[in-house]
Amino acid sequence: MAEPEQDIGEKPAVRIQNPKENDFIEIELKRQELSYQNLLNVSCCELGIKPERVEKIRKLPNTLLRKDKDIRRLRDFQEVELILMKNGSSRLTEYVPSLTERPCYDSKAAKMTY
């Protein structure tokens, strides 16, 4: 059964800031769940990182998201980037393996054409 229309929220596209990997994943947040903390938790869960490693959340190209009000302004497929701390400091991004370097990567599926 489909969800009621008012429960459907936004679907931002999220990625980790990484010069080697520029792909985004889409996440779904219900409208009543649009908050900074929820975006952070869901994004980190989907990307396999700990929330405490995130230094900043940026709406591309150059807007920092800092509070719930900022998150509620997101629209479907807006690109959001998580900027990670390096070794617990406030320095930007440590190395994060690309999808092709992760053990769950399926090279045969990546070569499929539709």
UniProtKB/Swiss-Prot annotation:
Tell me the protein's name.
Putative ANKRD40 C-terminal-like protein
